[in-house]
Amino acid sequence: MSERIRVPVALLRRASEVLLNHLESVEGDAVLVEKDYYWTIAAEQLYDAYAEPSKFTMGQLSECLENLERVVEDPSMSTSFALVWLADLLRGAGQTVAR
């Protein structure tokens, strides 16, 4: 069964602003993330809660950071997948600060 969830972009924008302001007040202008590599689950398995994932790959936060720096320098390079890089970095920052 597939359930679609409507996610308002305005909510994402406002939540990002609120949470990044909080992060900045706690950590300053940068977060020192101690781990660079992380596990990812294949996209086709990530949201299948009824099957145990079997396809794992490695991601690298420094690569996500480089990719986002390029997008910021040249917004014409923006792609929807850049949101995944942003999400990976936000997860790394959030998990670092939450410890």
Regions found by a protein language model. Give the residues of each.
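Small side chains
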Residues: 15-16, 42-43, 87, 94
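Exposed, low-complexity/repetitive linear segments and helix-based recognition motifs
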Residues: 14, 21, 33, 45, ...
